[in-house]
Amino acid sequence: MAPSLEEIRKAQRADGPAGILGIGTANPPNHVLQAEYPDYYFRITNSDHMTDLKEKFKRMCDKSMIRKRHMHLTEEFLKENPKMCAYMAPSLDTRQDIVVVEVPKLGKEAAVKAIKEWGQPKSKITHVVFCTTSGVDMPGADYQLTKLLGLRPSVKRLMMYQQGCFAGGTVLRLAKDLAENNRGARVLVVCSEITAVTFRGPSDTHLDSLVGQALFSDGAAALIVGSDPDTSVGEKPIFEMVSAAQTILPDSDGAIDGHLREVGLTFHLLKDVPGLISKNIEKSLDEAFKPLGISDWNSLFWIAHPGGPAILDQVEIKLGLKAEKMRATRHVLSEYGNMSSACVLFILDEMRKKSAKDGAATTGEGLEWGVLFGFGPGLTVETVVLHSVPL
């Protein structure tokens, strides 16, 4: 007798929660020190005459809590392509030519590391989720990555463009659903971000653009996600994903916008972004943790997208968080800057490494439950509930 639809459906689904089975990160070799960046930025964009603006930018960089950032764009390249250094010069072709090649390439570097840690043959990868804010092309970076890694042609791909800074949470939410609804699925998740599409010179009429120039940087991170790890071949979760939610914050229209134009990708930020996030964050926490009976936010380990120091400061104050709660987040902001969607995956990596180094009892700084937040255009907030594993 043929199996019933219910039996088929049950057989298709995994038994346990999705877990992160490997993490890898990569950055371009070229990096800039934040203390030196204002002088470099105003020189390379031929803007040294804008002395007041340069002072403002210096203050932004000083307050950013960033020590260094990695960037694919070098001084030599920018000198050869002056249109990218102007505030509003048509330059999309030049920018596109960079990102359609470099985004998948940097993604591959991170993916190779994640696959190595996972320790299984890449032929076991069933799904690819690729996320980037830049470089729309057909076929996309998901296809390029599949070719670069030599994955099976039958791998099931999903390409996410133009999401912005919350998307590190989005890819985890999607990977969780893919892994838990497809028995044996192993999902390669890649976030690869290159600022070549947003870099531009200063404008005294658009100070919000300068905020992005002070914060944004390049990086890629990759994860392998799967349910029911096969311990006989050495699969072991680093973190498990328990639930995932997305919401649009009230009264936040236009708080963060990005527009792809002939001049590249322009970013527009309202000052009140930290206020909007801190005002609404407790509602997201309540909805995520009430089912678990958790209401002490200091009992969680924290992985928050470091949009900028003001967001972290205001969230800490609003929730009464102890200073050490944002340690991993602030460390990644300091050493890498705001790498958009890749940031939270870098923070996951930093947290489990530091937890092991410090001899903590779990991958989550010795704690059992944690939260991962993504914030970005919308304002959109992604909330992922994480469960650590014993070390």
Swiss-Prot record:
One example GO MF annotation: naringenin-chalcone synthase activity
Keywords of the record: Acyltransferase, Flavonoid biosynthesis, Transferase
Encoding gene per record: CHS
Protein's name according to its UniProt entry: Chalcone synthase
Catalytic machinery residues: C165
Associated pathway: Secondary metabolite biosynthesis; flavonoid biosynthesis
Database matches in PANTHER family: CHALCONE SYNTHASE, HYDROXYMETHYLGLUTARYL-COA SYNTHASE
Catalysis: reaction(s): (E)-4-coumaroyl-CoA + 3 malonyl-CoA + 3 H(+) = 2',4,4',6'-tetrahydroxychalcone + 3 CO2 + 4 CoA
GO biological process: flavonoid biosynthetic process; polyketide biosynthetic process
Xref: InterPro entries: Chalcone/stilbene_synt_C (IPR012328), Chalcone/stilbene_synt_N (IPR001099), Chalcone/stilbene_synthase_AS (IPR018088), Polyketide_synthase_type-III (IPR011141), Thiolase-like (IPR016039)
Family of the protein in this entry: Belongs to the thiolase-like superfamily. Chalcone/stilbene synthases family.
Summary of the function given for this chain in its UniProt record: The primary product of this enzyme is 4,2',4',6'-tetrahydroxychalcone (also termed naringenin-chalcone or chalcone) which can under specific conditions spontaneously isomerize into naringenin.
Keyword DNA damage among UniProt keywords: no
Source domain of life: Eukaryota
Its EC number(s): 2.3.1.74
